[in-house]
Amino acid sequence: MFKLFTARQHDKIWDFDGGIHPPEMKLQSSTVPMRIAPLPDQLIIPLQQHLGPEGELRVRAGEQVLKGQPLTVGRGRTVPVHAPTSGMITAIAPHTTAHPSGLAELCVHITPDGEDRWREQQPWADYRQRDKMALLDRIHQAGIAGLGGAGFPTASKLQGGLNGIITLIINAAECEPYITADDRLMQEHADEVITGIHILRHLLQPQQVLIGIEDNKPEAIAALQRALRGQDDIHLRVVPTKYPSGGAKQLTKILTGKEVPFGKHSSSIGVLMQNVGTVVAIKRAVIDDEPLIERVVTLTGDALSSPGNFWARIGTPVLYLLKLAGFKPQNPPMVIMGGPLMGFTLPSLDVPIVKISNCILAPAETEMGLSEPEQSCIRCGLCVDACPAGLLPQQLYWFSRGEEHEKARNHNLFDCIECGACAYVCPSNIPLVQYYRQEKAEIRALDQESARAAEAKARFEAKQARLAREKLARELRHKQAAVKLTDADQQTVDAAVSRLTRQSDGSESVINIPAGQMPDNSAVIAAREARKAQARARQAEKQQARSTEETTDVVDPRQAAVAAAIARVKAKKAVQAQHVTTDVAEAGSEAMAEDPRKAAVAAAIARVKAKKAAQAQHVTTDVAEAGSEAMAEDPRKAAVAAAIARVKAKKAAQAINPD
């Protein structure tokens, strides 16, 4: 009984919230055997066909290449691309690629030579004899990226799962309408699928391996069961048809019952998932040494007369494949890359097939229905019920329209798998997925700008820290240079130390002065006198400099003229006074010689005249000073004062010398 219960638990499947059941539309192509597309006239190989940076070119225009030859270098998360066939590289130039933006990307243009010659190949008959790192390098150099649509580098994904992987899940659900590439691949190449699973099992050593496939693929289920041949280490799980059961988180929940936390990947709970097409590419790379140069592409839609699945070389133009399937252009023309829910309308039909191109849908005019205009949200909540990721599409829509980036991020916008279930059920015809894609792109752009700003800030701070260190080092060197003694000072110090040493050990005798004698201090006295003389000379120079500064001050021309006039008057009065005094003295001497009384009278007269002359000179000086003050206040007053001074001086002179 316990074994029966354990077996039932082992085969149990779970369900996920949300999801929809759109028309499948798979019978158009799933019942038709795969065909091999012939080589086109030109192949266009974009350098970036995966999630990550493009590789560095290894070829140049005009070079001849062989089938499988690498065109770019593969390092880290850079996945190389290879020549799909042999031929000539005619150009390396931008070209429109399969992207909703319609932007041009750098591509290698190859003109096939028709020979389809391979480069030298080195198959590995027994991969078990190779170590894990050699296997990972082989997968990486083969240019394998996730063929389910994400395009994540497979080798990087496997390397991250070398430790701690409990469950390996092979995604064979292929849940989106119209697409049957994996279905036909399993029907026709089931043995290669199982061999690829064994390679992954050898690499990862998981506890269990599960294949998840929807119940609407009975032929593929039967083919896998035949290929397994009763193997009990790989379990085939058939799950109900429900969109989007092929999502990574949704299929993990269905097969294990575990939910991947928000913001995490399935590897965080010990689960690693690979697509069926990726598994076949791994088998061919490891065992056959064939890089990823072709894939299965579904061509379907009512605008095609012979839909089906084709093995198409990477770089084949879409229009070339459509013509192989009997394309009938519609009005208006519409060709979708991918499915009707997650795909996008191609901007041009000359875009090339890339590694993640699984379907080309060419619907008829009536097949997709008329596109109705977008209307306002009525808050019905149907989008919330349909969301398989457990998000709030209505809130994310408002945040996206209002450019509230942080709120959109906090409401787990990046957990949206863009399945289109919300837009499918919306009665207002709101293209919700388009809003979410645009909001994600804007947030990524802002994050990149913030990262660049943080990097610039870090560089600036590092520069400032370096400049501060250099400044401290310079200051330290300057301090060390300042305290370093010159050669002369060092010699003086050394001589003093030497004298002290000689005195201490008695090698140099002390000078003794006999009693009653004075020491010879003449040299000291002479040095002191010399210093005093130098001090006096410096003091005299300072005084002379101050006088020069005083005399060289800027003087007003009128004030200078007044001062010069006053100086002349003073000099004239002094001469006249001296002349008067001399005359009086001479007269007095003569009179004294003749008569003593007359001499006394003459002397008295001379004293009176001298006193008046002195008073007149004092008055002139006062007037001049007053004139100077007035001139400082007003030039006109100064001129008047000078005139008055001259008049007074003239009167004084007349009083002194009436003759």
UniProtKB/Swiss-Prot annotation:
UniProt-listed PROSITE patterns: 4FE4S_FER_1 (PS00198), 4FE4S_FER_2 (PS51379)
4Fe-4S ferredoxin-type domain location: 366-397, 407-436
GO BP terms, alphabetized: electron transport chain
GO MF annotations in UniProt: 4 iron, 4 sulfur cluster binding; electron transfer activity; metal ion binding
Binding site for [4Fe-4S] cluster 2: C387, C416, C419, C422
Topology term for the membrane: Peripheral membrane protein
A Pfam family annotated for this UniProt entry: SLBB
UniProt binding sites for [4Fe-4S] cluster 1: C377, C380, C383, C426
Subcellular location: Cell inner membrane
Subunit structure and binding partners: The complex is composed of six subunits: RnfA, RnfB, RnfC, RnfD, RnfE and RnfG.
PANTHER family listed in its UniProt record: ION-TRANSLOCATING OXIDOREDUCTASE COMPLEX SUBUNIT C
UniProt xrefs under NCBIfam families: PRK05035.1 (NF003454), rnfC (TIGR01945)
Name of the protein in its database record: Ion-translocating oxidoreductase complex subunit C
Organism in which the protein naturally occurs: Yersinia pestis bv. Antiqua (strain Nepal516)
Gene: rnfC
